[in-house]
Design a protein with these regions (language model features):
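Active-site acidic carboxylates
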Residues: 1-126
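Structural motif
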Residues: 93, 160-162
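Internal catalytic-core helix/loop-beta-alpha segment
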Residues: 113-114, 120-160
Length: 162
């Protein structure tokens, strides 16, 4: 896996240390039968503050991925377009927010912008694409995602996003 990073569109946002760390996981990769794209947390809160260095963006806006999020947009758009053209389902995840402050974490959601967890326009879902609203970090825990994957006959997931 690590040796193949050199040829991938994300190479410019993955630093050498991370490539080295993941060398021990190297193996042949492939997309299995009946795949789906799982677009994880491409919401506005990850992009807020613009393409500043991540630490700086996150200091100003908790949860911002700064320049990493913005650099990932073009390859993400390319992958989504290719998947759609091939008829591969695209499924999005985002956080469910109760603006009254009631949620499964200790975060005070009343301080959030009301659109903080809307998917950014640059990669927004197209008509008919599924959006899974989650309360925790996992797209699977406490959500109907697995039921949707089974109903759709999906047997392989290509994950992207935050």
């Amino acid at each position: 896996m690590a040796r193949e990073f050199e040829d991938h569109c994300w190479r410019d946002i993955i630093d050498d240390d991370l490539v080295e760390i993941y060398k021990s996981y190297e193996r042949d990769l492939h997309v299995g039968e009946r795949p789906a794209i799982l677009a994880i947390d491409l919401y506005k809160n990850a992009y807020i503050g613009g393409d500043k260095p991540v630490i700086e963006a996150n200091r100003e806006h908790a949860g911002s991925c700064g320049e990493n999020a913005w650099k990932a947009l073009p390859p993400t758009q390319k992958l989504l377009a290719a998947a759609r053209a091939a008829g591969v389902p695209v499924i999005y995840t985002t956080r469910h927010v109760d603006t009254r402050g009631v949620n499964s974490t200790n975060r005070d959601s009343r301080k959030l912008r009301t659109d903080a967890y809307d998917i950014v326009d640059e990669v927004k879902p197209q008509d008919g694409e599924l959006i899974i609203y989650k309360e925790r970090a996992s797209a699977f825990f406490g959500t109907p995602l697995i039921a949707h994957l089974n109903r759709m006959g999906v047997r392989s997931i290509v994950a992207l996003g935050e």
